[in-house]
Amino acid sequence: NGTLVSADDFLWASAALVTSDAPKDLDLASELALMAAELGEERGFTVQAEAADKLLVAQARPQRYGTQYIFEPVHQRWKLYPVDPLTSDVERRSMGIPPLAELLQNVEELNDALRKDKDE
């Protein structure tokens, strides 16, 4: 019937909405993700962080948690979209996001895989 009741309902609805680029969808994704978290679904925090970062990136502002990567076609490489330096790894951890050093390592792994694909 389309009614959201359980933590899973809220989580999956928020996860679907966070794929959108529309600010109103991202706002709703954030709300639903927090509701999922309040109902006991820890992954709701991570989806909320993704929605918040995606909104900031759309506004050309530094992201807070570090969930958004961009591809630079000219350099043929991935890059972590700029992150607000005031956000701590403790804050990231509370949202289910890895520390900044690990996020930067993930970028290197993406670029290593990209280079490997080019060489094959």
Question: What residue spans do the PLM features occupy?
Answer:
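Alpha-helical protein-protein interaction scaffolds
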Residues: 1-36
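N-terminal alpha-helical interaction modules that lie
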Residues: 1-7, 61, 65-68, 98-105, ...
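Amphipathic alpha-helical repeat scaffolds of TPR domains
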Residues: 5-18, 43-58
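Structural helix-adjacent loops and short alpha-helical linkers that scaffold large soluble proteins
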Residues: 22-25, 43-44, 81
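Alpha-helical linker/edge segments of TPR/alpha-solenoid repeat scaffolds
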Residues: 22-26, 54-75
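TPR/TPR-like (Sel1-like) alpha-helical repeat modules
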Residues: 27-42, 69-72, 86
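Amphipathic alpha-helical packing elements
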Residues: 78-112
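Intrinsically disordered, compositionally biased glycine-rich interaction modules
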Residues: 111-120
